């Protein structure tokens, strides 16, 4: 009634059905049967004058005519000290793996803020550790592709391993300013001095001496562990890790070559040196990163003070995790070896490619990350909540298909002429897939459905109302006869008849449904409508009374789908 009144007295089926499903989600499973009733009701309402429609609404539901305030999408808070056209953000992943949900947060926030202030965003690969966090050659492109899938467009791109000469020049300047020195103490000796707040004996040598030692490092005079470059900080700082932190170390790249520059370099900047210098040289104005980097911010500010630079505005936010999926890089690597898992897009992983493969769309991640924003409190998202958001986004587009498991044959009797069955592909459209059901045809239902239709009327979706009569023993199958009672959807509703999905064997396709469960993958074998073969790879569909799934691969005799959620 309200839909008709708001649209010049004429209601439309599509928005009415969508509204019903939104308010009564459980009706989704029976929408094929409800749609005829809704269509009849709409025809009755549309025959009323618009004045009569308003009168009925005012009498029965006056609150529906009240104007409600519009709720706006949650927006990001402003950045401190930000001006239009002058904001420069950066997303700086380590290409030792691909991006997961937690990484997507700084990536999207950096992009959104750059857009908000009409500034620019930099993508910078921080790959200056060829040993402990060795880059994966394929990770660079995978990260680029993941960012593109998220809808992120960056203005500039840098790879730090290709910028080592630039970083070396900055390191020389830092030494000249008295802000760094070459330390030749053993790690054990330095730790003892650091813990007691005492300086290394090399610390107060003149910058010229340290520049000479730096040249000796470049010439290969020192081996791994014999010398490091340190930044001078506060030796009484309460956090011992801040005290004269390591800025660069020697790594024997003949043993662990870098995937891009090979064994060309032996002195490698640490994260804090490379990030701090590049943030300044690239003009970064705002850094958005997790609060685990607070100590890194403290360390880097010492370097900035030595050089007389202004440190960027830094926003630290809490960690973002997702229940039921694996986000830890180290755990992923371990499982790849132990369980022979796929490296990046295994659907058990919380990587963007893993989530995408199981049917999570980017709009879902947008909404989650915009909701948590830059809050400093850790956010743990349940998969149930993620699924609810994802469902609200994919439900309006995902086509529906019947699918059964543990097939049980029914021989349909009780009618003389063929029945044209209409299986709805989506409740908001008139698109259907039509079947011709002839007397004596065999359809297959799930064994679990058979257990609930004994001794009662049931409705075969899109066909009509039936009742079981007797077992059938054939040389080809053992099943049951089902006699047609009526075609009426209203009668099915009146008697609360269970609605049963079915397939015809000659018009079906085998479906392997993969269901991620923590560290396991469960498999269900279905028989689905053969029309499913018309869907493209990557499409998300809904199997009636099973849930949403993404088409992962297609073969002539089988389609593999990854289960997303109900």
UniProtKB/Swiss-Prot annotation:
<keyword id="KW-0436">Ligase</keyword>
<dbReference type="Pfam" id="PF03950">
    <property type="entry name" value="tRNA-synt_1c_C"/>
</dbReference>
<keyword id="KW-0030">Aminoacyl-tRNA synthetase</keyword>
<dbReference type="Pfam" id="PF20974">
    <property type="entry name" value="tRNA-synt_1c_C2"/>
</dbReference>
<dbReference type="InterPro" id="IPR011035">
    <property type="entry name" value="Ribosomal_bL25/Gln-tRNA_synth"/>
</dbReference>
<keyword id="KW-0963">Cytoplasm</keyword>
<keyword id="KW-0648">Protein biosynthesis</keyword>
<comment type="function">
    <text>Catalyzes the attachment of glutamate to tRNA(Glu) in a two-step reaction: glutamate is first activated by ATP to form Glu-AMP and then transferred to the acceptor end of tRNA(Glu).</text>
</comment>
<protein>
    <recommendedName>
        <fullName>Glutamate--tRNA ligase</fullName>
        <ecNumber>6.1.1.17</ecNumber>
    </recommendedName>
</protein>
<dbReference type="InterPro" id="IPR020056">
    <property type="entry name" value="Rbsml_bL25/Gln-tRNA_synth_N"/>
</dbReference>
<feature type="short sequence motif" description="'HIGH' region">
    <location>
        <begin position="93"/>
        <end position="103"/>
    </location>
</feature>
<dbReference type="GO" id="GO:0005524">
    <property type="term" value="F:ATP binding"/>
</dbReference>
<dbReference type="InterPro" id="IPR004526">
    <property type="entry name" value="Glu-tRNA-synth_arc/euk"/>
</dbReference>
<keyword id="KW-0067">ATP-binding</keyword>
<dbReference type="InterPro" id="IPR049437">
    <property type="entry name" value="tRNA-synt_1c_C2"/>
</dbReference>
<dbReference type="InterPro" id="IPR050132">
    <property type="entry name" value="Gln/Glu-tRNA_Ligase"/>
</dbReference>
<dbReference type="GO" id="GO:0004818">
    <property type="term" value="F:glutamate-tRNA ligase activity"/>
</dbReference>
<dbReference type="InterPro" id="IPR020058">
    <property type="entry name" value="Glu/Gln-tRNA-synth_Ib_cat-dom"/>
</dbReference>
<dbReference type="GO" id="GO:0005829">
    <property type="term" value="C:cytosol"/>
</dbReference>
<dbReference type="InterPro" id="IPR014729">
    <property type="entry name" value="Rossmann-like_a/b/a_fold"/>
</dbReference>
<dbReference type="GO" id="GO:0006424">
    <property type="term" value="P:glutamyl-tRNA aminoacylation"/>
</dbReference>
<dbReference type="GO" id="GO:0043604">
    <property type="term" value="P:amide biosynthetic process"/>
</dbReference>
<dbReference type="InterPro" id="IPR000924">
    <property type="entry name" value="Glu/Gln-tRNA-synth"/>
</dbReference>
<dbReference type="InterPro" id="IPR020059">
    <property type="entry name" value="Glu/Gln-tRNA-synth_Ib_codon-bd"/>
</dbReference>
<keyword id="KW-0547">Nucleotide-binding</keyword>
<dbReference type="Pfam" id="PF00749">
    <property type="entry name" value="tRNA-synt_1c"/>
</dbReference>
<comment type="similarity">
    <text>Belongs to the class-I aminoacyl-tRNA synthetase family. Glutamate--tRNA ligase type 2 subfamily.</text>
</comment>
